[in-house]
């Protein structure tokens, strides 16, 4: 059998432990849509900062903790900023793109080599700090700049949203960590786990 016949029979080979581009694009698109929908459909406005409480962090953490930094970062940033843009909060969209993107990326980067609950908890905490601190700094600057308020007024208004943001990420972690563990467990039962999840420390894909 020639080399060409072998390729024709088996198809292109995918290096073990690496996601295929098709899977990456598909999962990214799905989670970008889920982040956007969960952010847009479940909102509680916060008048003091012109922002809103939402459930998007649940999906951001699920995508990052389960599928790593690329998918977590893209879906978090793009999905959340799209929701801002179409939901009447377009002035916040650039801040959201960066902050929520970093939230998903950091959580995914820390958790990508291990699936232990301890590492997932650390990854969630790091992503949460990025989100809460990022919005505090952005809103402090934005409120003072747009409304012509003093720096103190901007900080005071941004501080009013901190408890809501903390509640948002805590709720996201409570849901996302067990869901991520469950998704990984189900995927690992297949013969293609490393092609979906990517390489994980201490995990060997099941051989078919």
What are these regions (language model features)?
Residues 1-208:
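Loop-helix junctions at membrane interfaces
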């Amino acid at each position: 059998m020639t080399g060409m016949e072998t390729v024709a029979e088996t198809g292109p080979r995918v290096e073990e432990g690496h996601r295929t581009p098709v899977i990456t694009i598909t999962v990214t698109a799905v989670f970008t849509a889920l982040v956007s929908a969960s952010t847009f459909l479940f909102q509680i406005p916060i008048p003091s900062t012109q922002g809103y409480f939402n459930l998007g962090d649940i999906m951001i953490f699920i995508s990052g903790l389960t599928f790593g930094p690329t998918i977590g970062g893209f879906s978090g940033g793009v999905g959340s900023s799209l929701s801002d843009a179409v939901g009447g909060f377009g002035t916040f969209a650039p801040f959201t793109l960066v902050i929520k993107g970093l939230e998903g990326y950091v959580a995914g980067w820390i958790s990508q080599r291990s699936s232990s609950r301890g590492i997932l908890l650390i990854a969630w905490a790091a992503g949460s700090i990025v989100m809460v601190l990022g919005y505090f700094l952005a809103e402090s600057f934005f409120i003072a700049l747009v409304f012509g308020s003093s720096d103190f007024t901007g900080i005071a208004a941004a501080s009013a949203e901190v408890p809501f943001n903390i509640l948002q990420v805590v709720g996201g972690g409570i849901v996302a960590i067990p869901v991520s563990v469950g998704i990984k467990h189900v995927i690992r039962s297949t013969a293609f786990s490393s092609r979906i999840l990517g390489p994980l420390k201490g995990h060997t894909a099941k051989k078919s």
